[in-house]
A protein has these predicted regions:
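The conserved cystathionine-beta-synthase
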Residues: 18-35, 42, 83-85, 91-109, ...
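A glycine-centered beta-loop-beta connector
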Residues: 31, 39-55, 105, 113-128
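Tandem CBS (Bateman) regulatory domains
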Residues: 1-14, 52-90, 97, 102-106, ...
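Short N-terminal signal/transit or membrane-insertion segments
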Residues: 12-20, 47
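Short, surface-exposed, polar/charged, turn-prone segments marking secondary-structure boundaries
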Residues: 38, 45-46, 67-70, 77-79, ...
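Short, charge-rich amphipathic segments
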Residues: 32-40, 59-60, 66
């Protein structure tokens, strides 16, 4: 039953993270190598921000209309994650229920919700995770990662 389902049952726990002092070329490389669009930014296990493909696209659009990988590499390697990450975070706890997660997604225009316990990042939920979970629940199946 959805009312009893906690966030911990469908959050992703194997996370790739970056540090605020990492450069945006590392972020670009991680996005290119993986099938995700959000990266939690962590300092000493504490979530300090999130960087997404949206921030990366804003930066690369500033370069110009003609793509030049060398210019792109030089430019992105000069920008720190901490300079462009989203610091205004909406988070959720692993013990919260699915309705709280839906409510938080409904609050704003974002597609990932960091799961934080005692100040530390323990998981991540994306809007895709939530839709997939609800679809499987409605089909009568349990969604497990």
């Amino acid at each position: 039953m959805l009312t009893n389902t906690q966030v911990s049952h469908f959050m992703t726990t194997e996370l790739v993270t970056v540090h605020p002092d990492d450069t945006m070329d590392k972020v670009r490389d991680l996005f290119e190598a993986n099938d995700f669009h959000h990266l939690p930014v962590v300092r000493d296990e504490i979530l300090v921000g999130v960087v997404s493909t949206r921030e990366l696209l804003k930066l690369t659009r500033n370069i110009g209309t003609k793509y030049d990988k060398k210019i792109d590499d030089d430019y992105l390697s000069s920008i720190l994650v901490g300079e462009v990450m989203n610091k205004e975070l909406i988070t959720i706890g692993p013990g919260e229920n699915i309705y709280k997660a839906i409510e938080k997604f409904n609050q704003g225009y974002f597609h990932s919700l960091p799961v934080v316990y005692e100040g530390k990042l323990v998981g991540l939920i994306t809007s895709t995770d939530l839709i997939r979970f609800m679809y499987n629940e409605l089909k009568g199946e349990r969604f497990l990662f």
